[in-house]
A protein has these predicted regions:
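Conserved N-terminal beta1-alpha1 strand-loop-helix module at the mouth
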Residues: 1-61, 260-262
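Glycine-rich adenosine-cofactor-binding loop
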Residues: 171, 227-233, 321, 329, ...
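Catalytic beta/alpha-barrel core
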Residues: 5-7, 28-36, 55-57, 62, ...
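NAD(P)-binding Rossmann-fold cofactor-contacting core
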Residues: 359-380
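Rossmann-like adenosine-cofactor binding region
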Residues: 381-448, 453
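Adenosine-phosphate binding glycine-rich loop
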Residues: 424, 428-488
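Phosphate/diphosphate ligand-binding glycine-rich loop within oxidoreductases
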Residues: 224-332, 432, 440, 444
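Active-site-adjacent beta->alpha loops and helix N-cap segments on the catalytic face
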Residues: 35-47, 88-102, 118-121, 145-157
Length: 488
């Protein structure tokens, strides 16, 4: 069931949240009672449009808070609230006294760890200890300090499901966001959402509107195929918008999630049986080739990949950056038979250079760390130029493959402009709305191609690899632009 969690101060605030919940498909509304007086609580309990969970969290225990919690739980029970959620730390005596008064209300007995996710053995012990007190549902929620922490929760759910225990379990925090979806898909009874990103009752909650409209949460089933993106950071990524809309458009039983990770090998080891395919972004496009994989001759020649499918748990690698950029080169004649400077020496730079070589370009590469530019130039059989020395020649085209708005990049373009004016600047950084590079080009009336065009071009190929289906470029492009400022 989908829960909208909210902490109102007044009945009026509650009514706004209730309306939002009804409009966006909530099954339950969790009312946090810490800030409510008795009069407002009674008004809320009398409103029956949505079933409710009454919850009272105590962060720092005191006699007055425990007394207030006890009083409000009793009011909720006496008014036949559908669920109460009681933290096991309130103790057996507190819980059993309330249980004696319960008639129609269902009990959720919960455990929270706001600092870390214990190891699986300890999580099992916590569940076993909780089950010594009879309840309708048990809840174990922990804080994720890495994406890997979600794996322990998934294994705990697997054990609970086998025992027939109704368990609500997921990780909180930024690293627990995608784990919430995996938990719900793999048997967690409830999915908790927020009113909006500013009114979360727990860190890592996602707004109900985004859950409903982007992720189609009501259509997340055990059979749903999971895709996602690995990299760090991922705040700038819009792949979740593109692919989830694509799945909706094509009626695919699939979902796409963000996985901000530090170690791709470790992530693949733990999650390869939960995920069907991945997009790969900075900083792992080159590193991913070091892992055991199945890949084509082109992937090996480029030296980077941005897409992965799992077949019998084995990763198959693709490079849709190459396919997408090649399309841009075909459309833009200035990217053919030109003298081109590529800025950057990572996986995207490799892909761009490989594509440009197919169209008779004279290619030079530079990078903040010149040694990396020299190494890449030697490998790709092109020329490296030192960004700190005077350039010996002019450039027809400049292509940026690095994350935008850094001082090195802007100062480098200013240096180029002091010597000559390129005919075209291509900025592969996705954040085109705030690109200082593109703004500088506009001032000098230089033609540009922005990173959004590149993103869409490669994502279309990626979607085809994931689903075997083509997608309407016009529709998906419009959707991503319309929802561009949404965050996951």
């Amino acid at each position: 069931m989908i829960v909208l969690s909210y902490q109102p101060k007044t009945f009026r605030e509650f009514k706004k949240a209730l309306q939002y919940g009804l409009e966006n498909g909530a099954d339950l509304l969790e009312v946090r009672g810490e800030k409510l007086n008795e009069k407002e609580l009674l008004k809320i309990l009398s409103e029956k449009s949505l079933p409710k969970i009454f919850t009272y969290r105590i962060n720092q225990f005191s006699y007055s808070k425990i007394k207030d919690a006890s009083k409000k739980y009793r009011i909720a029970i006496q008014n036949n609230v559908e669920f109460i959620d009681i933290d096991i730390n309130l103790g057996k005596s507190f819980i059993n006294k309330l249980k004696k008064e319960i008639q129609n209300t269902k009990l959720i007995l919960s455990y929270h760890n706001y600092e870390k996710t214990p190891k699986l053995k300890q999580l099992i012990s916590i569940l076993d200890y909780s089950r010594k007190i009879s309840a309708d549902y048990y809840k174990i929620v922990t804080f994720a300090n890495s994406v890997i922490d979600n794996y322990n929760i998934l294994k705990l759910l697997e054990i609970a499901n086998k025992k027939g225990v109704r368990l609500i379990s997921h990780c909180m925090g930024e690293y627990g966001k995608s784990g919430r979806f995996l938990s719900y898909k793999n048997g967690s009874s409830f999915f908790y959402s927020s009113y909006n990103s500013n009114k979360q009752t727990a860190e890592g909650q996602i707004s109900l509107e985004v859950l409903n409209k982007i992720f189609r949460i009501k259509q997340l089933y055990p059979s749903t195929r999971v895709y996602g993106i690995i990299g760090n950071p991922l705040k700038q990524s819009k792949s979740w918008l593109f692919h989830n809309f694509g799945f909706k458009l094509k009626k695919s039983n699939a979902i796409y999630l963000n996985f901000p990770i530090y170690d791709p090998e470790l992530f693949i080891y733990y999650f390869k049986n939960y995920i069907r395919g991945l997009s790969i972004t900075i900083p792992f496009k080159e590193e991913i080739l070091k892992l055991p994989n199945i890949s084509s001759k082109i992937i090996k020649e480029i030296g980077s990949a941005n897409t992965m499918l799992f077949k019998d748990s084995k990763p198959i690698l693709f490079n849709t950056d190459y396919l997408g950029f090649k399309e841009i080169v075909k459309k833009e004649k200035l990217l053919q038979n030109s003298k081109t400077l590529v800025i950057g020496a990572g996986g995207s730079a490799r892909t761009v250079i490989y594509a440009l070589k197919k169209f008779n370009n004279e290619i030079l590469v530079t990078n903040r760390t010149y040694d990396r530019a020299e190494s890449l130039a030697s490998e790709m059989e092109i020329k490296a130029i030192n960004p700190r020395k005077k350039f010996e020649s002019d450039f027809d085209v400049v292509i940026n493959t690095t994350p935008g708005n850094n001082f090195f990049l802007i100062n480098l373009l200013k240096k180029i402009l002091s010597q000559n004016k390129p005919k075209l600047v291509v900025d592969l950084d996705l954040n085109f709305k705030e690109s200082k590079l593109l703004a500088l080009c506009k001032t000098h009336k230089i033609k540009t191609v922005n990173g959004f065009e590149f993103f869409i071009a490669q994502a279309v190929h990626q979607f085809k690899i994931f689903t075997g289906k083509n997608i309407s470029l016009r529709k998906v492009k419009r959707f991503v632009l319309d929802n561009y400022d949404k965050q996951f």
